[in-house]
């Protein structure tokens, strides 16, 4: 289940995250390494090492077959509409990097990534090795589908792919991604969005509660949290589609579309 990487000595690189909160969450390292296949912003060392405080012992370029890069993870309307996921799709492939990290780092990563599901996958390293990895995938929500990422987010993927020397055709694909073109919201529109937060979250309570209760009945506490969050996201974007998109434009889908 957990693949063992060939770690370099770790003494020179502390896994202590910058904040005390992270330190308490990851107080000790078990020494057991996990190969984590990443394809999104965690390709970029400014995010993975800098923001998340991870210290990978190895980073191996590879391809995951049978999965496709998709921007189906809901973000913040009109600001950061969509994030990346690897979605199972026959005949597709997704390029990325297998990071060797400790079990504690992996558990911290999963906890902080929100509503992703964990799956075990087999990756083909560029050097010919077969790697058993763990990766994160996200369900496609009916009210969200897939949308364009922000330029900021797409740039993280592009820079990360170049940093790790990913396939040139893959980099060209990332360079060709359409990015979300933000719309200028007036003061009234901004106020309406802000005032809608509370009622929208209240409207999501029944669906989120039912989803959480169903998963809790199986004893899966983390799954219950994820299911509740996913249902909340779907309601939020349902409100966005029904009420705000006709007035302010569809966040994550440019006007020309």
Q: What does each of the following model-derived ranges do?
A:
Residues 13-20, 24, 28-257:
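Glycine-aromatic micro-motifs
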Residues 1-12:
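N-terminal chloroplast transit peptides
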């Amino acid at each position: 289940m957990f693949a063992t990487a060939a770690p370099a000595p770790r003494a020179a690189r502390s896994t202590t995250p910058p904040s005390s909160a992270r330190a308490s969450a990851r107080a000790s390292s078990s020494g057991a390494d996990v190969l984590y296949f990443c394809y999104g912003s965690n390709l970029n060392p400014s995010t993975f090492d800098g923001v998340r405080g991870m210290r990978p012992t190895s980073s191996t370029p590879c391809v995951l077959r049978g999965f496709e890069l998709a921007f189906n993870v809901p973000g913040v309307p009109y600001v950061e509409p969509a994030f990346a996921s690897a979605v199972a799709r026959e005949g597709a492939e997704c390029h990325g990097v297998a990071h060797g990290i400790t079990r504690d780092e992996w558990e911290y990563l999963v906890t902080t990534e929100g509503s992703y599901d964990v799956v075990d996958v087999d990756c083909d390293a560029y050097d010919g090795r077969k790697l058993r990895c763990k990766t994160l995938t996200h369900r496609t929500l009916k009210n969200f589908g897939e949308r364009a990422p922000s330029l900021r987010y797409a740039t993280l993927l592009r820079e990360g792919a170049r940093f790790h020397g990913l396939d040139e055709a893959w980099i060209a694909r990332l360079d060709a991604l359409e990015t979300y073109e933000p719309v200028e919201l007036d003061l009234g529109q901004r106020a309406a969005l802000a005032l809608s937060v509370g009622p929208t979250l209240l409207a999501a309570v029944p669906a989120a509660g039912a989803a959480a209760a169903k998963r809790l009945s199986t004893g899966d506490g983390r799954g219950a949290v994820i299911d509740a969050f996913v249902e909340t996201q779907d309601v939020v974007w349902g409100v966005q589609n029904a009420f705000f998109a006709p007035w302010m434009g569809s966040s994550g889908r440019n006007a020309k579309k």
